[in-house]
A protein has these predicted regions:
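Cytosolic catalytic domains that perform sulfur/thiol-centered chemistry
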Residues: 1-286
Length: 286
C-alpha cells in the first residue's frame, strides 16, 4: 500500500479513528534573537493548548536532535532516533501523519528524518494547524500519547549531505546546491544571517516561501512547483543538495521536489550554521 506524501484536511478528518495512524504535532517556535539570529523554543505549550485529536507532540530540538553537536537540530544517530521514535509509538506497521503550526517546514523536517532512516509510511498535512483550525475541525486538549512501539532505523546516507560533500559540490557541474532562505538572505543584504552574510558559492536560491501559498500555508500546485524549480535549473541536476540556516527550511524544498518525483534529494544538515562557523569555507554575496 502506498502512502501519499501530502494529505489534506478532509483526508485526515475521515481517518482519525484508524488505529494504524500516528499523528504528530512537530511545531517549534523561532523567536528573533540579536545574538543567535533565532532562538528555538519548544512548541509543546501550543500543543497543550490544542491539537488535532489523537496527535502526540514531537520535540524536534530535544528528543530528535543530537544535543552534543553544538548546532541546533542536528540529526541524531540511528540508534538515538530509533529509540526516540519507538518511545513516541511509531513502528513499521504504522502510518505517520505530520503537521506543524507557523510553517510546514517543521513537519517536513521530521518527514525527511524519517525517510533518511528508511521509513516511508509518512505523510505531511497540507496547510498544517492553521488550515485545520481555520476550517473549524475538531481540536483536542488531552495530553495524547501512543503506546511504545518498535522502530528500526535503516539509514539512507545519500539523503544526508556533509560539509565536505557540499564543498566539493561548489565546483561540480552535475550537482545543484539550493539555498532555501529568502532572497535577501541569499544575496547577503539581510541583517538576519548565520555568522557571515551570503550564500555557499555556486548555489541557486529557491526560497521555501516561494513554494507555498502564504495565505493558506499549503503547497502550491505541482505545475507551479515545477515551474519554480525548473527555472532555477534544479530539476535537471544529477544530484540536488538543499540547505538553509539550520537544516529546516531546506527540508521543505526537498519535500517539494519529492512531490515532483525527486526522492533522492539530500539535505545539508549543518547548513549555514555549520558552514559560516568555519572561516576556511567560502561565502559569496550578490
Amino acid at each position: 500500500m502506498s502512502h501519499p506524501l501530502l494529505v489534506d484536511t478532509d483526508w485526515l478528518a475521515a481517518r482519525l479513528a484508524e488505529t494504524s495512524l500516528r499523528i504528530f504535532d512537530c511545531t517549534t517556535r523561532l523567536v528573533p534573537d540579536p545574538v543567535q539570529t533565532y532562538r528555538a523554543e519548544s512548541g509543546r505549550p501550543d500543543w497543550e493548548r490544542g491539537h488535532v485529536p489523537g496527535a502526540a507532540y514531537v520535540d524536534l530540538q530535544g528528543a530528535l536532535s543530537d544535543r552534543t553537536s553544538g548546532l541546533r537540530f542536528t540529526m541524531p544517530s540511528a540508534d538515538h532516533f530509533a529509540a526516540a521514535m519507538s518511545a513516541l509509538g511509531l513502528g513499521a506497521d504504522h502510518h505517520a501523519v505530520l503537521y506543524s503550526a507557523g510553517s510546514n517546514w517543521w513537519a517536513t523536517r521530521v518527514w525527511w528524518m524519517l525517510r533518511a532512516f528508511g521509513f516511508d509510511r509518512v505523510s505531511v498535512l497540507d496547510g498544517g494547524w492553521e488550515k485545520w483550525t481555520a476550517e473549524r475541525r475538531p481540536v483536542c486538549t488531552a495530553l495524547c500519547a501512543y503506546p511504545a512501539a518498535h522502530f528500526v532505523a535503516h539509514p539512507r546516507p545519500l539523503l544526508l549531505a556533509r560539509k565536505d560533500e557540499v564543498l566539493a559540490a561548489t565546483t561540480a557541474d552535475d550537482v545543484a546546491l539550493v539555498n532555501a532562505l529568502t532572497r535577501r538572505q541569499h544575496t547577503g543584504e539581510s541583517e538576519v544571517h548565520y555568522g557571515r552574510p551570503g550564500h555557499i558559492p555556486s548555489s541557486v536560491n529557491v526560497p521555501y516561501l516561494d513554494l507555498v501559498d502564504r495565505a493558506t500555508n499549503t503547497f502550491r500546485p505541482a505545475a507551479e512547483l515545477r515551474a519554480v524549480l525548473d527555472h532555477a535549473g534544479v530539476l535537471s541536476a544529477g544530484r540536488v543538495i538543499t540547505y538553509c540556516g539550520g537544516g529546516i527550511a531546506a527540508t521543505g524544498v526537498a519535500f517539494a521536489l519529492a512531490l515532483l518525483g525527486r526522492d533522492d534529494v539530500a539535505v545539508y544538515d549543518g547548513s549555514l550554521s555549520e558552514w559560516c562557523a568555519d572561516p576556511s569555507l567560502p561565502i559569496e554575496k550578490g
